[in-house]
Design a protein with these regions (language model features):
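Helix C-cap/helix->beta junction micro-motif
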Residues: 221-222, 349, 388, 431
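PLP-dependent enzyme catalytic core of the Aspartate aminotransferase-like
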Residues: 95, 103-106, 260-261, 374-376, ...
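Conserved core of the PLP fold type I
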Residues: 74-221, 233-262, 266, 423, ...
């Protein structure tokens, strides 16, 4: 096959999509690793993937439940009740949210619209609340997938909020958002919303009630939306780092009228994280006090509808209360065990990390292993690790404010996790030997 023609020779593509195709060398490691992932049976010589935020600890149980409880019938082959979700599923999502998110006012089925995942929900939300070029505020570091969710479809602008050493999930962070809002609007970008990942990805900690209240007051002051991505709501765990962790607090649990016009508050949830099913594309927007936004969201849902099959799988799980009563505590136990294993091994190698109490990843510091304090050096280390058949996510893709941060997914089967860490530490040991540095307690760096 011949090489692809240069971009300037592609007049048949729109300018808006050409922006999506601009070269991004930070994504090249991911592209190289994706189809080489390790599997002990089908690809034993592959790359151990510790970069993707997937919870693999309960996959067997979820798979078993699906296979035992799902059967296609002719109704699944129809358009069903339309693109924004069946009444049955939306009722069960509402019941689930009322039980686990503890909203200050009950969530109802008509407050919810479904789609094919959390990412499409973010895209649709942006499409509805502003114009191309308008901005949505997110603090650094941030989940790298938000770039595509926000910018590739709706053509919103992801406006990055620098933290400069301030904890992103703290009350103090709000001042950074306010300063960034003023700077953005002075340069011509109208800010329409704030997006919080609660719990935070990649840092793995929830926002406190006080911090959420402060963000609500900030958004109310400027009449901008607050979108809370709560896909890790159930993925919390106990650890020696946080024996009494800050509990997950949904934005919906606040007495919102004290802080903000409730019509500005919205939540995204999906099956991907808490239910260990990134590949089953179904999620939702929850907006209890803004019927107009929900109507707008539904008006474009035909482009992002979840399949009847995906909706039925999630519905079956919601309907099985006894399974969920076992499943979530067991998931948390396994998350805690896996987190303890990874952080213990990191400590053996004197590798610092950001303590976490939620999510499936840990944020680590490998800055001492960089050749130089640059993004290119960070990318070079990521490539070296990938070629040594271990893939971790580099901090630059999360717009980390420090070079040398990486994210490791610890919610991985133990054998795979052990193999991946062995490969990681071997590379770090080699680097230390090349520099004449001492090795760690196990012979690794």
């Amino acid at each position: 096959m011949g090489e692809a023609p240069p971009m300037e020779r592609l007049p048949y593509l729109s300018d808006r999509v050409k922006d999506n195709l601009k070269a991004n060398k930070l994504a090249e490691v991911r592209a190289w690793c994706y189809d080489k992932q390790y599997d002990p049976i089908t690809n034993p010589d592959g790359v151990v993937a510790l970069a993707i935020a997937e919870n693999k600890l309960m996959r067997d149980e979820i798979t078993k439940h699906i296979n035992e409880n799902f059967k296609i019938n002719p109704w699944h082959l129809t358009y069903g009740e339309g693109p924004a979700g069946t009444t049955a599923l939306r009722r069960h999502i509402a019941s689930y949210v009322n039980e686990y998110f503890r909203p200050s006012a009950p969530v109802k089925a008509n407050h919810i619209a479904t789609c094919n995942g959390a990412g499409p929900a973010v895209n649709n939300f942006c499409f509805c609340v502003g114009e191309p070029g308008d901005g949505i505020l997110l603090s650094k570091p941030l989940y790298t997938g938000f770039f595509g969710d926000i910018e590739h479809g709706s053509k919103f602008k992801l406006v990055q909020v620098p933290m400069e050493g301030i904890d992103p999930v703290s009350v103090e962070a709000v001042a950074q958002y306010e300063e960034t809002l003023h700077q953005a609007e002075a340069s011509g970008t109208k800010i329409r919303a704030v997006l919080l990942a609660n719990p935070h990805n990649p840092l793995g900690r929830p926002y406190s009630k006080e911090a959420l209240a402060a963000f609500c007051s900030f958004c109310d002051k400027y009449n901008i939306h607050l979108l809370s991505d709560e896909v890790y709501a159930q993925s919390w765990f106990l650890s020696k780092d946080f024996p009494k962790p800050e509990p997950f607090v949904s934005i919906l649990s606040l007495d919102l009228e004290k802080y903000i016009n409730p019509a500005l508050i919205h939540v995204i949830y999906a099956m991907s994280k808490d239910f260990c099913a990134n590949g089953i594309r179904v999620g939702c927007l929850i907006s209890p006090s803004n019927d107009e936004l929900l109507s707008a969201f539904k008006s474009i849902s035909g482009f992002t509808r979840a399949s009847q099959l995906a909706e039925q799988v999630w519905l079956n799980l919601f309907e099985d209360g006894s399974f969920l009563n076992w499943y979530f505590p067991e998931m948390r136990r396994r998350l805690a065990d896996s987190y303890a294993y990874v952080t213990g091994r990191l400590e053996e190698q004197a590798i610092s990390y950001s303590p976490a109490s939620t999510g499936v990843c840990v944020w680590i510091d490998l800055s001492e292993y960089l050749e130089h304090d640059t993004r290119d050096a960070e990318l070079a280390l990521d490539w070296r690790l990938a070629r040594a058949k271990v893939w971790i996510a580099m901090g630059a893709t999360f717009v980390s404010e420090k070079h040398g941060n990486y994210r490791i997914t610890f919610a991985t089967p133990r054998a795979d996790l052990e193999l991946g860490l062995d490969r990681l530490f071997k590379v770090l040991s080699d680097i230390r030997e090349e520099r004449g540095l001492m090795t760690g307690s196990n012979g690794y760096a």
